[in-house]
Amino acid sequence: MGSSEVSIIPGLQKEEKVAVERRRLHVLKALKKLHIEADEAPVVAVLGSGGGLRAHIACLGVLSEMKEQGLLDAVTYLAGVSGSTWAISSLYTNDGDMEALEADLRHRFSRQEWDLAKSLQKTIQAARSENYSLTDFWAYMVISKQTRELPESHLSNMKKPVEEGTLPYPIFAAIDNDLQPSWQEAKAQETWFEFTPHHAGFPALGAYVSITHFGSKFKKGRLVRTHPERDLSFLRGLWGSALGNAEVNRNYIFDQLRNLLTLRGDVWRRTVANAKYIGRRIFAPLLRLQQSLQRERPVLEDEGGEPNYNWLTEMLENWTRTSLEKQEQPDEDPESKGSVSDFLDFVRKTSICASKWEWGTTHNFLYKHGGIRDKTMSSRRHLHLVDAGLAINTPFPLVLPPTREVHLILSFDFSAGDPFETIRATTDYCRRHKIPFPHVEEAKLDLWSKAPASCYILKGETGPVVMHFPLFNTDACGDDIEAWSDTYDTFKLADTYTLDVVRPLLALAKMNVRENKKKILREMRNAAMLYYPKHYAQSCSLV
């Protein structure tokens, strides 16, 4: 159990310092195996961008090949956004066993089954929380279907290999959605939020809470009410809550809600106790719910929501078209985990959250904290945390602070569209906050984006060297980049991902690492020789 107090400490947290120091010993051994002599271990960070299932699968391929080539053992930090967080977290739940991880991936995508009943149980349970939001629904009903897994472990379970230094230190990115206006206007550093096996918090403020108490209620820096640590399924939903734009996400959610009332009898029996004649028992309450939401429409609009009740009308119409036999499935499982009232409460809460478009609601651990001068941060009772890809689709802002002393960044970009948009956005962010980052002329980025190669090496006068690896590139894809992009579109549902679709993407991601191994080793060797923060002789260049 972590500390029950809020920590306001500039720089690295104590647990991270200890873990990183232990990791240095393993990195030095790994460098020696790679024939790189170093008195001090350079800090290498690997970044994985967002990109839904495409990023999930490609990031697994990158990690697997880096392990195979002996490169992963020389890495200090692993950081991810959105779909890459699903891959990175899987590395730790499998204790770093890449063979087991790939076997699990093949198993998951060799079958079409998805345990809807279990996912629905988890969602109904989550709806009992006062802070239930669309993130809960998204995590258990959408992301679990996309990835075909529902992990129940926790971030704190990852501590052992991290503290022993046997695996890199993981950082999972999110942003504070309430600060989006500040981000749009000034790229406010406070927007970024991070999760590690030890803590969750705002690195720009040095404000953290133990990961075991993330979601618990705090006031004036003291624990007021303890809530259970959120499981990895929920966090994956939070980190990956922007697979598409608002319209795409809305359609995902409404489609799932529409389908709930046409569930098979066995699903009802596994999720709702005393499910006999459930149709007759829930139709009237759902009808009242629809009428209630219509009455509340002006209130919800005042709160900035965009009410849309068509899905609920369709739910009711679907139900009336369902045969009586299906509506009145008998209850054969008295051990079911929910009740009809639980189900109705879940639908009611989801309806309200959908109307208000409320995501990522959690208690603000900085509420009324006297050590925070910014009242915007301490006056709110709740935070609303969402996918960091809505700001920058890769976690550069979390590894660039000088306290982490990163010397070399391997940026694997699995984004849709322009693979240099993350470089542009990070350049703008760093310019505004005077953070060292290689500058690249816009004309050069435009040229590169038309026919991207597999690796770009960016160097500035100070700060880390950045190696940027576009997933779809001319070296691997030739003239077929557009075809590859269409095949692995971010918005494609998991149903379209068969093993025949997964294997080529996994192989492509591995090849990008393998074909650039010499360049990676060269930059690792340079980092070991030119220990940060010594100046690099070259200006930004392509190697």
Each PLM stretch: what is its role?
Residues 1-44, 48, 93, 100:
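N-terminal charged/capping segments associated with class I S-adenosyl-L-methionine
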